[in-house]
């Protein structure tokens, strides 16, 4: 029986799982939305919620505690300066998981995990203000 056993193994070693959660947390902080499997998203949610709650304090001890979990300095800066300020009045529930069907190769359940009230432009793939005429005129030139 699995009584009092917290977390999912995700079929990887503990060091791999720790590194994977840290990398996924950096990606989620950077892009504010990522696509992954449903069990990984469910495992990432409490991991990132704790980091955002610590980022709301914005003191040296909280910064060092976050640094022990994730190693990317730019992600830590965004976590404290942007997300900590954005969710200052929210007592929890900073992320949502949206199911997105099944993966083609192995039918693994896929989900998006994203921040609530996220910045739409943070994803980085928003098209520019190029009109169709500009694209057609630049097509022949190199």
UniProtKB/Swiss-Prot annotation:
GO biological process terms on file: translation
Pfam families per UniProt: Ribosomal_L17
Organism: Rickettsia bellii (strain OSU 85-389)
Gene Ontology cellular component annotations, sorted alphabetically: cytosolic large ribosomal subunit
Record note on quaternary structure: Part of the 50S ribosomal subunit. Contacts protein L32.
Name used for this protein in its record: Large ribosomal subunit protein bL17
UniProt-listed PROSITE patterns: RIBOSOMAL_L17
GO molecular function: structural constituent of ribosome
Family: Belongs to the bacterial ribosomal protein bL17 family.
Keywords: Ribonucleoprotein, Ribosomal protein
SUPFAM superfamilies in UniProt: Prokaryotic ribosomal protein L17
Family matches, as InterPro entries: Ribosomal_bL17, Ribosomal_bL17_CS, Ribosomal_bL17_sf
């Amino acid at each position: 029986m699995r009584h009092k056993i917290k977390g999912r193994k995700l079929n990887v070693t503990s060091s791999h799982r720790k590194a994977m959660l840290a990398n996924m947390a950096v990606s989620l902080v950077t892009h504010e939305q990522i696509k992954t499997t449903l069990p990984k998203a469910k495992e990432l949610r409490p991991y990132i919620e704790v980091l955002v709650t610590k980022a709301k304090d914005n003191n040296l001890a909280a910064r060092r505690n976050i640094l022990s979990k994730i190693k990317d300095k730019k992600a830590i800066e965004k976590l404290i300066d942007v997300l900590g300020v954005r969710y200052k009045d929210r007592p929890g529930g900073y992320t949502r998981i949206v199911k997105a069907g099944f993966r083609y190769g192995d039918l693994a359940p896929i989900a998006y995990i994203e921040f609530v009230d996220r910045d739409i432009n943070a994803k980085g793939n928003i098209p520019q203000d190029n009109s169709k005429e500009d694209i057609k005129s630049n097509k022949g030139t190199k």
